[in-house]
């Protein structure tokens, strides 16, 4: 939890409580339904919560923004972002029902009111949103093909609507088809921990 306060010192008391509650909740649920690698659960705040919040290094979502988290798994990046942006709505989608259940139970336990959930494949979600966020779910080209239909034409943020992905490693080949409009942000510029040396946020306006 300290690592979250290190980079986000201005959290409200409610947000601090919500972030602090995540550890015990994920430890408990992960023992029943494996949504985080068992050897990685001890790194929950650095590898999962703070990593999710890396998206804020590209944009501060305005109140009223709608966001779909595609392939949310156990709730990342959607749940940490929903805590940080209580006036933004998040719709968390995953094709694996038991993972959606974990995300739903965690969100309910910490009293998140700005999240909804759906057990479905990405292709089945027809609604539109200002942004789609995702954490290394599939190659960029495949992801863009699927979520084009889900991006609203109504603009209300400093960045044009589009896709914001958390990715790692070498991305040159993956971003090549979109290189003229893709923005890549290195999380190592914001977070000093070694884990973030190869981690990036990729933004593609759509």
Residue ranges and their predicted role:
Residues 28, 32, 45-63:
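Conserved alpha-helix/loop element of class I SAM-dependent methyltransferases that forms part
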Residues 156-170:
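Conserved beta-strand signature within the Rossmann-like core of class I S-adenosyl-L-methionine
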Residues 53-134, 144:
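Conserved SAM/SAH cofactor-binding pocket of Class I
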Residues 168-206:
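Active-site capping/gating segments
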Residues 140-150:
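A short, conserved alpha-helix within the catalytic core of class I
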Residues 30, 106-107, 151:
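Conserved hydrophobic residues forming the short capping helix/wall of the S-adenosyl-L-methionine
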Residues 83-89, 151-154, 158:
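Conserved S-adenosyl-L-methionine
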Residues 1-38, 42:
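N-terminal auxiliary segments of SAM/dcSAM-dependent transferases
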């Amino acid at each position: 939890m300290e690592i979250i306060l290190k980079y986000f010192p201005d959290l409200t008391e409610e947000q601090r409580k919500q972030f602090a509650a995540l550890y015990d909740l994920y430890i408990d649920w992960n023992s029943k339904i494996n949504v985080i690698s068992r050897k990685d659960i001890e790194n929950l705040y650095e590898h999962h919560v703070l990593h999710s919040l890396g998206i804020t290094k590209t944009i501060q979502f305005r109140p009223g923004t709608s966001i779909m988290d595609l392939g949310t798994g156990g709730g990342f990046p959607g749940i940490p972002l929903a805590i940080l942006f209580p006036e933004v709505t998040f719709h968390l989608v995953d094709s694996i029902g038991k993972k959606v259940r974990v995300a739903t139970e965690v969100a309910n336990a910490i009293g998140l009111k700005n999240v909804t959930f759906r057990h479905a494949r990405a292709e089945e979600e027809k609604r539109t949103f200002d942004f789609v966020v995702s954490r290394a779910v599939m190659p960029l080209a495949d992801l863009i093909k699927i979520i084009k239909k889900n991006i609203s034409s109504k603009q209300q943020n400093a960045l044009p609507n589009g896709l914001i992905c958390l990715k790692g490693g070498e991305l040159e080949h993956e971003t090549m088809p979109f290189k003229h409009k893709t923005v890549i942000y290195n999380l190592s510029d914001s977070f000093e921990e070694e884990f973030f040396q190869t981690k990036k946020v990729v933004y593609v306006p759509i």
